[in-house]
């Protein structure tokens, strides 16, 4: 490429850039300096980085608390933990939220309402399953006929937060991990890889299993052997005493 007229050549521009990046006269050799060159004061970024930075810095959660796990999340609203530093602004409408925090037991009757709230949230949206009851059903998963064995059977879950209940510090750790996930996403990839099977569209079918608590432990061999000495002891008949004065059944005339 040849330069025409008064336009500077590529080599002259490179020399000017190297000269501007060098130390200023009178400054110590190797000390950091601020240059006046425009190329040294411009930060280059991408659309994905800018978009992800804006989203991870302003997550608006929709709090869906159904049990005791929500009490631990309510502690974050106070001044001790101050979760506002992460840009979390609780919303009461799913149309204004992009993060759904499910804390507590999800029942069959609340399942359709939860799915409806999730579908009303705009894309991109994320879900945090908080607590053992939300993830696996918890202590209600043994013999309950109304508890859902994991909220991921109804809606997709981006992050699982185990605990019974999780501490507020664990909730902060979950939010930080979710921010890292948001920061590594791409707008084009999310549009192309939009899942169509994100949640179950059929009714939650429960598999019949044998009950765990049946009361049969009272009829176990070891229990019978332990109770046999006491069972074989004859019981003494209760003592009967007769009253000397008859009991009147009515008022005397």
Curated annotation (Swiss-Prot):
Cofactor: [4Fe-4S] cluster
Catalytic activity field: a plastoquinone + NADH + (n+1) H(+)(in) = a plastoquinol + NAD(+) + n H(+)(out); a plastoquinone + NADPH + (n+1) H(+)(in) = a plastoquinol + NADP(+) + n H(+)(out)
Subcellular location: Cellular thylakoid membrane
Similarity-based family: Belongs to the complex I 20 kDa subunit family.
Keyword Zinc-finger on entry: no
Protein's membrane topology: Peripheral membrane protein
Enzyme class, spelled out: translocase
UniProt main location, coarse: membrane
Keyword terms of this UniProt record: 4Fe-4S, Iron, Iron-sulfur, Membrane, Metal-binding, NAD, NADP, Plastoquinone, Quinone, Thylakoid, Translocase, Transport
Complexes and interactors: NDH-1 can be composed of about 15 different subunits; different subcomplexes with different compositions have been identified which probably have different functions.
Entry keyword annotation includes Thylakoid: yes
UniProt GO MF annotations: 4 iron, 4 sulfur cluster binding; iron ion binding; NADH dehydrogenase (ubiquinone) activity; quinone binding
Binding site for [4Fe-4S] cluster: 68-69, 133, 164
Cofactor note: Binds 1 [4Fe-4S] cluster.
Phylogenetic lineage: Bacteria, Bacillati, Cyanobacteriota, Cyanophyceae, Synechococcales
GO cellular component: plasma membrane-derived thylakoid membrane; respiratory chain complex I
A Pfam family it matches: Oxidored_q6
The protein's name in its UniProt record: NAD(P)H-quinone oxidoreductase subunit K
GO BP terms: aerobic respiration; electron transport coupled proton transport; photosynthesis, light reaction
EC number from the UniProt entry: 7.1.1.-
Summary of the function given for this chain in its UniProt record: NDH-1 shuttles electrons from an unknown electron donor, via FMN and iron-sulfur (Fe-S) centers, to quinones in the respiratory and/or the photosynthetic chain. The immediate electron acceptor for the enzyme in this species is believed to be plastoquinone. Couples the redox reaction to proton translocation, and thus conserves the redox energy in a proton gradient. Cyanobacterial NDH-1 also plays a role in inorganic carbon-concentration.
Signal peptide: none
């Amino acid at each position: 490429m040849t330069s025409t007229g008064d336009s500077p050549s590529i080599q002259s521009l490179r020399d000017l850039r190297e000269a501007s990046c060098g130390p200023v006269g009178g400054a110590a050799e190797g000390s950091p300096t601020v240059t006046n060159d425009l190329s040294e004061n411009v930060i280059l970024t991408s659309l994905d980085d800018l978009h992800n930075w804006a989203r991870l810095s302003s997550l608006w959660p929709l709090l869906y608390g159904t049990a005791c796990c929500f009490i631990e999340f309510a502690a974050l609203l106070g001044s001790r933990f101050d979760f506002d530093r992460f840009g979390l602004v609780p919303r009461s409408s799913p149309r204004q939220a992009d993060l759904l925090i499910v804390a507590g037991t999800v029942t069959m009757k609340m399942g359709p309402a939860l799915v409806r709230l999730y579908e009303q949230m705009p894309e991109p949206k994320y879900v945090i399953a908080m607590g053992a009851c939300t993830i696996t059903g918890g202590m209600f998963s043994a013999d309950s006929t109304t508890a859902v064995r994991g909220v991921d059977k109804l809606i997709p879950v981006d992050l699982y937060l185990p605990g019974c209940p999780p501490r507020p510090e664990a909730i902060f750790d979950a939010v930080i991990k979710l921010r890292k996930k948001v920061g590594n996403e791409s707008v084009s990839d999310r549009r192309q890889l939009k899942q169509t099977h994100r949640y179950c569209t059929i009714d939650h079918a429960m598999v019949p299993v044998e009950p765990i608590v049946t009361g049969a432990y009272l009829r176990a061999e070891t229990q019978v052997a332990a109770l046999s000495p006491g069972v074989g002891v004859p019981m003494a008949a209760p003592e009967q005493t007769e009253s000397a004065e008859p009991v009147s059944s009515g008022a005397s005339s």
